[in-house]
């Protein structure tokens, strides 16, 4: 079997490595220090994104290293890479704790954008997906609950019930990824809409 990267992946990987060497590694300690300082003083600046992140995002977008995670089926969104093509880029980004955010490839935004790209209607895509793809907003994902082993999502107990033109969400979540980000504007919440359905068909997600 041939395990070499194809030309597209190799070109992106070389560009990514150059960006990491020129832009990310030199400021790694400074960025972490800025985050730690923000968490001091009773945590008042804990969730404030350091200004250098915004600068790096702009440079990554200009370099064509943006939204690398969405596969071919979601074009024109993303780079149209397969998982095998995206994997070595993840490996490179993973060398620095915060670098995936620079390229708009960090959770929970990646998963939420994929959900919106696949299942969202045109109104939802315009309101939420496009600003996420542009890096204008951040998002959150709420699945984990304190009373159950939530890594198995069939255990979750939060209910989502239709009430006229609205939905009522009743439950308790914690470890909600992205919820405290200062730019979080949309949350994807997992709950159960049919407790009597087969075990793996009870759940829904709501914006």
Predicted regions and their residues:
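Amphipathic, small/basic residue-rich leader segments at the start of a protein or domain
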Residues: 1-107, 123-127, 131
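Short, solvent-exposed loop/turn elements at beta->coil junctions and helix N-caps
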Residues: 75, 144-148, 175-177
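Short loop segments at secondary-structure junctions
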Residues: 93, 118-121, 163-165, 192-196
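N-terminal glycine-rich flavin-associated loop
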Residues: 103-123, 152
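A short, Trp-centered hydrophobic/proline-enriched beta-strand micro-motif
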Residues: 135-144
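Active-site-adjacent elements of ketosynthase-type condensing enzymes
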Residues: 148-156
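A structural signal for short hydrophobic beta-strand segments in well-ordered beta-sheet cores
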Residues: 158-161
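A short core secondary-structure module
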Residues: 166, 170-207
